[in-house]
Amino acid sequence: MDDIYKAAVEQLTEEQKNEFKAAFDIFVLGAEDGCISTKELGKVMRMLGQNPTPEELQEMIDEVDEDGSGTVDFDEFLVMMVRCMKDDSKGKSEEELSDLFRMFDKNADGYIDLDELKIMLQATGETITEDDIEELMKDGDKNNDGRIDYDEFLEFMKGVE
């Protein structure tokens, strides 16, 4: 199993862990070994708002069910949920960033120029100076052509929480 996902499990909030544990426990009630069977796993994940395809589910199961027992314990389940959340957020954030770029790109030419950046930043109601706007433009405009293209925008937004 990937250490990166095990590390990500440690980043889950108590609330998230409790939510996952409650869903997991519903399906473990009759099990003596404290594990859920792989066929029940899909139901649990759908209950938690995840919607893996049968292929994705089988792939996840194969990765975490190291002993081939056909069951998944809670720790393995948490790792799988972190993977699903990560995959989910990747798709959404890309889509959200694309929408955000289009909002900034007022004339729809595929670039954000200084005026468009200024209009959007001032519309937020935050106090922002001309110098701040120019500094942001410089940070975002990696190839120094005086405007920010979509790839530059994505790169710039990676550093923004």
From Swiss-Prot:
Troponin is the central regulatory protein of striated muscle contraction. Tn consists of three components: Tn-I which is the inhibitor of actomyosin ATPase, Tn-T which contains the binding site for tropomyosin and Tn-C. The binding of calcium to Tn-C abolishes the inhibitory action of Tn on actin filaments. Belongs to the troponin C family. Ca(2+) 3 binds at D141, N143, D145, R147, E152. GO terms for biological process: cardiac muscle contraction; diaphragm contraction; muscle filament sliding; regulation of ATP-dependent activity; regulation of muscle contraction; regulation of muscle filament sliding speed; response to metal ion; skeletal muscle contraction. Ca(2+) 1 binds at D65, D67, S69, T71, E76. Cardiac muscle Tn-C can bind 3 calcium ions per molecule. Domain I does not bind calcium. Signal peptide: none annotated. PANTHER family: MYOSIN LIGHT CHAIN 1, 3, TROPONIN C1, SLOW SKELETAL AND CARDIAC TYPE. This is Troponin C, slow skeletal and cardiac muscles. The modification Phosphoserine is found at S98. Residues 16-51, 52-87, 92-127, 128-161 form the EF-hand domain. InterPro entries: CALM/Myosin/TropC-like, EF-hand-dom_pair, EF_Hand_1_Ca_BS, EF_hand_dom. Ca(2+) 2 binds at D105, N107, D109, Y111, E116. The modification N-acetylmethionine is found at M1. Keywords: Acetylation, Calcium, Cardiomyopathy, Disease variant, Metal-binding, Muscle protein, Phosphoprotein, Repeat. GO terms for molecular function: actin filament binding; calcium ion binding; calcium-dependent protein binding; protein homodimerization activity; troponin I binding; troponin T binding. It is linked to Cardiomyopathy, dilated, 1Z: A disorder characterized by ventricular dilation and impaired systolic function, resulting in congestive heart failure and arrhythmia. Patients are at risk of premature death. Cardiomyopathy, familial hypertrophic, 13: A hereditary heart disorder characterized by ventricular hypertrophy, which is usually asymmetric and often involves the interventricular septum. The symptoms include dyspnea, syncope, collapse, palpitations, and chest pain. They can be readily provoked by exercise. The disorder has inter- and intrafamilial variability ranging from benign to malignant forms with high risk of cardiac failure and sudden cardiac death. GO terms for cellular component: cardiac Troponin complex; cytosol; sarcomere; troponin complex. Changing D145E: In CMH13; increases calcium sensitivity of the myofilaments. Pfam families: EF-hand_7 (PF13499), EF-hand_8 (PF13833). Changing C84Y: In CMH13; increases calcium sensitivity of the myofilaments.
